[in-house]
Amino acid sequence: MKIENRRKGSCTTVLVGRKASIDGSTMIARNDDGHEALDPQRFIVIQPEEQPRHYKAVLSDLELDLPENPLRYTSTPNAVLKEGIWPAAGINSANVAMSATETITTNPRILGLDPYVENGMGEEDLVTLVLPYIKSAREGVERLGQLLKTYGTYEPNGIAFADKEEVWWLETIGGHHWAAVRIPDDSYVVAPNRMNIDEFKFDNDDYMCSSDLKQLIDANHLNPDFEGYESHYNLRHIFGSSSIKDSVYNNPRTWYGQNFLGNPSEDPQNQELPFICEASRKITVEDVKFVLSSHFENTKYDPYGSTNSPEERKLFRPIGINRNHSVHILQVRNNVPDELAGVQWLAFGANTFNHVVPFYTAINDTPASYRDAKGEYDPTNMYWLSATTAVLGDSNYDLFVDLRNTFELNTMAKFHEIQNETDKNFETAEDKIAYLTQANEKLAEAAFKAQTELLGRMVVLGSANMKLRFDFND
């Protein structure tokens, strides 16, 4: 399949260092957005014996042998596999999390030097090729970097890794090059669909890159900055974009997320918003979910606004959007037994009317309502139930938003209650994996019941406010 015809994602990422989070955990989170509104997703666990030993891509002619002894890992693949697996994200049995990918931008100068590789790797492949084989976030960067050097890529992507201690962000550069940054423990990132890494230090252990990246920049006069030309390297300036599209599609998302998380600024179109922000308060899972569901609330750019103009409502691309296929918040907790550390908070469908569920990842199966989505509509599956709720909610947001808010408060409280109880009684369980698998069943049951109840209440409320009505009756 030609590069220009391949499917492209369109996501938003949030990264949180362990000292920036409320409980000392690391978090990497992303909306898995697509190019069309519906694309059913599944939540599964891959056992070592199920991992292929020889991999063949669907969208390219890439083939390679994979190492022996893979780790168990979770993933959220497409239900319809005609364009590949697209695992999106997961946590492995070493409690290493990976999210892949955030589509980013590039420029013709680097592509003229290091063109894309027609039969290289892409988003459909990366989790399968990396996550089962790494035991730290840094190892994830190293393995992916080596794969990029060997096989190349046909698209620009950002990839996140986390373990108990570290959060890393890697961005591909051209066909074979890459750069990665360790996010400081006290900081966070809100990353849209552009090249995000700004200041880069080649002589620092918290930065990693292709071995010849600095030489590539210097020898080919790629650095556009005057100030500190020989020592200052802003990779967004060198390899990325600063376009009109960025000013309406990308930068406003970063601006809104940073404002909400405590780093306010005035200009939503600013091309120089920082990549990394020091946290001004401790960040919760609920904070991350709000950012990834947001649509410029309390600003004149809200598509659901009632006091702004039609032009203002359509000016910027919101983070929460109809093309949200799923959202994951991969949390690696400290100060708990290893089996409890990896938590994959997960929701399907447009984020305005869904809820994230804290699924444990040291498991041997996933709940059927999250595992068994098909391409055909089926409201007994959480993907389709969430999609139904989102469509109805979008029809009259102001009418339904209070129901949504109450629903989210109550469901998140219930999930925390189940999680606290599961954590508390974990040591008494004889079969730890079976115990956590059953806890996930309890979480899924509560989630499905709550989502069904929300939809029912929305139908009842909406039926009394339909346009097709007449106030006289018999």
From Swiss-Prot:
One of its GO terms (biological process) is proteolysis. It catalyses: an L-aminoacyl-L-amino acid + H2O = 2 an L-alpha-amino acid. InterPro entries: C69_dipept_A-like, Peptidase_C69. The active site is at 11. This is Probable dipeptidase B. GO terms for molecular function: cysteine-type exopeptidase activity; dipeptidase activity. Keywords: Dipeptidase, Hydrolase, Protease. It is an enzyme of class 3 (hydrolase). The keyword Hydrolase applies. Pfam families: Peptidase_C69. Its EC number is 3.4.13.19. Gene3D superfamilies: Penicillin V Acylase, Chain A (3.60.60.10). It comes from Lactococcus lactis subsp. lactis (strain IL1403). Belongs to the peptidase C69 family.
